[in-house]
């Protein structure tokens, strides 16, 4: 590698770190909890350690009534988001929860926050939302919370492109299609009209990927596997999701495109039928603003589940020593039979420390089929490892 290339990579890493450190990056989770719960097999004695992201999936896992869920994230913004969701459950008003996170907007959000929600938040989350509760106040240019945060800004750009091209009615027909044939028809009509030269250029830029929470390591993994690079990967992933999987319950892409959920297409934590059940269980969630390694050093124990999202990708290339140390602590704190779930933009297993494979059994027989029906569809692989 040339000295110039090394400098460029360092600048890219610094850019990514500056974007994701304290900004709200993920306003919703991008891992399918329906797949997760089938793989995890949670029960009443489960002690879960997971990365927070937007907190949607932690709430979903509560439906299986685990003993405790430790949500760990080095970004305080992500934990603040989960704490606000928990506050809405503690406030005992389903309609308010739906307004904030189902519709993504609430008239008078600031008044509601100070009168009803702020008292439920820890000091760090209070500081965050004191300055940003207006994210839920609708306006013409930013009509939804789901167009806020760094990933939300890119979603807004796609949304505006759809509106400008007059494609929104067709998009709704696509999302509400009755069968795969209808989905394929509308997708083939719409897809070429979304991607102009500017969008194609933008998707190749490192700053765009940083806004979406995609580090340079993941980008390289994708480009190594796909001849057409990142753009080809994105377009082929979208084609799979929009033409080969039913969209009627695909709330991930509905909220990304429209900025809102519907009662029939939303995460479980927003479904009215689960509100009181989750309200009784949200006290089982604990948030920790630190790295996973720091959490394990401060909170040793025998945990039954680790949910690592795509975090391993972030360390694999640039911080192999840190990756190895993290795995040593995971294995040291894992109970026998512990289930470890993670995803990757490539074939991450080849990047894991050698000693890991002595202690784990990878269940590709379980993950291969479920990965194909994952409603998000933007990861190259899903991995479930069971501690021997």
What are the roles of these predicted feature ranges?
Residues 24-47, 56, 323-324:
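Conserved alpha-helix/loop element of class I SAM-dependent methyltransferases that forms part
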Residues 336-345:
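Conserved beta-strand signature within the Rossmann-like core of class I S-adenosyl-L-methionine
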Residues 365-388:
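Core SAM-dependent methyltransferase catalytic element
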């Amino acid at each position: 590698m040339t000295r110039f290339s090394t400098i460029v990579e360092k600048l890219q890493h610094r850019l990514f770190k500056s974007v994701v450190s304290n900004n709200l990056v993920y306003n919703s989770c991008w891992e399918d909890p329906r797949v997760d719960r089938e793989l995890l097999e949670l029960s009443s004695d489960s002690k879960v350690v997971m990365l927070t992201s937007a907190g949607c999936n932690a709430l979903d896992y509560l439906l299986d009534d685990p003993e405790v869920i430790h949500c760990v994230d080095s970004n305080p913004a992500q934990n603040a988001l989960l704490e606000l969701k928990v506050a809405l459950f503690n406030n005992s008003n389903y309609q308010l929860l739906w307004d904030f996170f189902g519709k993504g907007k609430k008239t008078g959000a600031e008044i509601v926050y100070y009168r009803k929600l702020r008292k439920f938040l820890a000091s760090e989350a209070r500081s965050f939302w004191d300055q940003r509760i207006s994210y839920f106040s609708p306006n013409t240019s930013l009509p939804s919370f789901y167009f806020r945060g760094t990933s939300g800004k890119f979603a807004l750009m796609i949304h505006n492109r759809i509106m400008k091209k007059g494609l929104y009615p067709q998009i709704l027909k696509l999302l509400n299609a009755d069968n795969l044939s209808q989905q394929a028809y509308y997708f083939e009509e719409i897809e070429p009209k979304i991607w102009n030269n500017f969008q194609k250029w933008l998707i190749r830029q490192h700053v765009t990927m940083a806004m979406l929470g995609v580090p340079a390591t993941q980008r390289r993994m994708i480009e190594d596997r796909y001849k057409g690079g990142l753009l080809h990967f994105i377009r082929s992933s979208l084609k799979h999701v929009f033409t080969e999987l039913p969209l009627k319950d695909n709330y991930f892409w509905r909220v990304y495109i429209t900025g809102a959920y519907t009662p029939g297409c939303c995460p479980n934590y927003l479904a009215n039928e689960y509100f009181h059940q989750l309200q009784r269980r949200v006290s089982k969630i604990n948030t920790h603003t630190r790295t996973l390694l720091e959490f394990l050093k401060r909170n040793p124990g025998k945990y039954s589940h680790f949910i690592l999202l795509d975090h391993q990708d972030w360390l694999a290339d640039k911080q192999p020593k840190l990756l190895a140390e993290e795995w040593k602590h995971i294995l040291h704190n894992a109970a026998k039979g512990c289930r470890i779930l993670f995803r990757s933009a490539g074939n991450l297993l080849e990047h894991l420390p050698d000693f890991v494979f002595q202690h784990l059994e990878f269940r590709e027989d379980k993950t291969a089929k479920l990965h194909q029906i994952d409603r998000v569809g933007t990861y190259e692989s899903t991995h479930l490892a069971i501690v021997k």
